[in-house]
Regions:
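Feature marks short, highly hydrophobic, charge-poor N-terminal signal-anchor/signal peptide-like helices
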Residues: 1-14
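PLD-like (HKD) phosphodiesterase/transphosphatidyltransferase domain
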Residues: 6, 19-105
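Short acidic, S/G/P-rich loop/turn micro-motifs used as interaction or catalytic elements
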Residues: 74-82, 110-113, 172-174
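DNA-contacting interfaces and partner/effector-binding or oligomerization modules
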Residues: 103-134, 152
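HKD (HxKxxxxD) catalytic microenvironment of the phospholipase D
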Residues: 128-176, 181
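Short amphipathic alpha-helical interface segments
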Residues: 194-209, 226-227
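The alpha-helix within a helix-turn-helix
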Residues: 215
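Residues in the recognition helix of alpha-helical DNA-binding motifs
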Residues: 224-232
Length: 235
């Protein structure tokens, strides 16, 4: 059954979000459920700017009472502004964990994601890696199964920064994204396991590589390299 795209375009200027959402929706085979979900999207979605997007990230993390679950790019900051955003997220992770809030992040499985993964992990988040995330098209965070904050890049590409986003205060949408998140989470590689895998591979190619060299190459603290090498008995 064809979806009424013109109606969606008229409501909240959500055209950029539709392709990705359709991938999620089409995974749910119930035709009636898809129709209901699309109606809910058009009724509740609100487009937000880049600054509003990160303001909403901050607000959501500050007010979350039970859980924060996100699939994000995890790409390294390119300038001071982006680094400040990462620092503020680290701070909110620490605050959330002190309140007993569960914080889980999925990142694309790639060595160049280890720096941000390490920073979030050190702040108290549980981090895993998956090789087939859709963060090149969309990145999202679900707060307390109440609403979803979806970020869109300036152009397709897993390293492109978030340009704008959509705030969807909908438990129904939150459940859809959580289902997708939980499926990937169950398949994903834990932070320590992936870091150990990368270090083991590096050591196999360069057995004499120093901790300092590995730290520099992976852009993570030397202490973290030592910890994983010791716990995993690598080298």
């Amino acid at each position: 059954m064809a979806f009424d795209i013109s109606t969606i375009l008229l409501v909240a200027e959500i055209a950029l979000l539709i392709p990705t959402l359709l991938l999620i929706i089409l995974g749910r085979r119930e035709e009636k459920g898809r129709q209901t979900l699309l109606r809910e999207i058009t009724n509740t979605a609100r487009m937000v700017s880049r600054q509003e997007y990160f303001n909403n990230v901050q607000f959501g993390m500050q007010t979350a009472m039970k859980s924060i679950r996100g699939a994000v790019t995890g790409s390294n900051p390119r300038n001071a502004e982006q680094d400040e955003i990462i620092k503020s997220i680290e701070d909110q992770i620490r605050r959330a964990r002190k309140r007993g809030v569960s914080v889980e992040y999925l990142l694309l499985k790639s060595p160049d994601r280890l720096q941000i993964a390490n920073r979030y992990h050190a702040a108290g988040a549980e981090v895993r890696f998956h090789s087939s995330l859709i963060v090149s098209d969309v990145r999202y965070v679900v707060f307390d199964t109440k609403y979803v904050l979806i970020g869109l890049p300036s152009s397709v590409g897993a390293n492109n920064p978030t340009r704008e986003g959509y705030l969807i205060p909908s438990e129904g949408m939150a459940e859809i994204f959580l289902h997708q998140f939980n499926t990937k989470w169950a398949e994903a590689t834990r932070y320590d396991e992936y870091l150990a895998e990368i270090l083991s591979e590096a050591k196999s190619h360069s057995p004499n590589a120093s901790v300092e060299l590995l730290s520099s190459q992976l852009q993570i603290p030397a202490e973290e390299v030592k910890r994983v090498l010791a716990t995993q008995r690598i080298g």
